[in-house]
């Protein structure tokens, strides 16, 4: 094998100048080939990234039209079924659970006799039904104390507790609140 290479080199050196091709620099050819490959790769990457960018914009436009943007879970609000399950009561200034309820912290209006109130079970704060329903539609916490509102399901049936205005739950929570902050559940 070495002899064959040696003979080829001798024949290449012994060729006449008239028959020899014009000299060229092999380093220049190698540099041009590398640059051509790099240019092809760069153009390919640009094409792929542009396609990905256009697909992302198209999917974002489609999702904006069909779905609202995602919101953090804490500020998502409560479902209407859960809102309806929260207890209501009719305000009467002389009734025991309503003695500490003076005004709605949302609209800042004093409660009048006959106003329909919703008392939050976790903290015992009371608000006008329309005010608190609007608030809880976009928030899941009490507007006064910011306590997260958690409605527990019935252990027997798995459903939400009924919304009765005469249930013991709101009265008990309000009475505990009247006794002092140390007695809160």
Swiss-Prot record:
ZnF bounds (RING-type): 104-146
Subcellular location: Membrane
A Pfam family assignment: zf-RING_2
Lineage start: Eukaryota, Viridiplantae, Streptophyta, Embryophyta, Tracheophyta
SS bond partners: none
Sequence segments annotated as region (Disordered): 161-185
Gene3D superfamilies to which the protein is assigned, alphabetical: Zinc/RING finger domain, C3HC4 (zinc finger)
Molecular function terms from GO: transferase activity; zinc ion binding
Record-given protein name: RING-H2 finger protein ATL8
PROSITE patterns assigned: ZF_RING_2
Family: Belongs to the RING-type zinc finger family. ATL subfamily.
Keyword Ligase set for record: no
GO biological process: protein ubiquitination
Membrane topology: Single-pass membrane protein
Pathway where this protein functions: Protein modification; protein ubiquitination
GO CC term (a single one): membrane
Superkingdom, natural source: Eukaryota
Catalysed reaction, written as an equation: S-ubiquitinyl-[E2 ubiquitin-conjugating enzyme]-L-cysteine + [acceptor protein]-L-lysine = [E2 ubiquitin-conjugating enzyme]-L-cysteine + N(6)-ubiquitinyl-[acceptor protein]-L-lysine
Broad class of the protein's primary localization: membrane
Keywords carried by this UniProt record: Membrane, Metal-binding, Transferase, Transmembrane, Transmembrane helix, Ubl conjugation pathway, Zinc, Zinc-finger
Enzyme Commission number(s) from the entry: 2.3.2.27
């Amino acid at each position: 094998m070495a002899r064959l290479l040696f003979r080829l080199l001798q024949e290449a050196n012994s060729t006449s100048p008239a028959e020899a091709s014009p000299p060229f620099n092999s380093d220049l050819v190698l540099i041009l080939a590398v640059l051509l490959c790099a240019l092809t790769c760069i153009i390919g990457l640009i094409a792929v990234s542009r396609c990905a960018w256009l697909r992302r914009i198209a999917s974002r436009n489609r999702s904006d039209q069909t779905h609202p943007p995602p919101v953090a879970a804490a500020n998502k609000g409560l479902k209407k079924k859960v809102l309806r399950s929260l207890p209501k009561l009719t305000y009467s200034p002389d009734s025991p659970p309503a003695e500490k309820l003076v005004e709605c912290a949302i609209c800042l209006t004093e409660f009048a006799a006959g106003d329909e109130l919703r008392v939050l079970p976790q903290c015992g704060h009371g608000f006008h039904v329309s005010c608190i329903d609007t608030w809880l539609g976009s928030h899941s916490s009490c507007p006064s104390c910011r306590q997260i509102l958690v409605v527990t399901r019935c252990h027997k049936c798995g459903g939400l507790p009924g919304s009765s205005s005469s249930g013991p739950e709101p009265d008990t929570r309000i009475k505990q609140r009247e006794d002092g902050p140390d007695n809160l559940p």
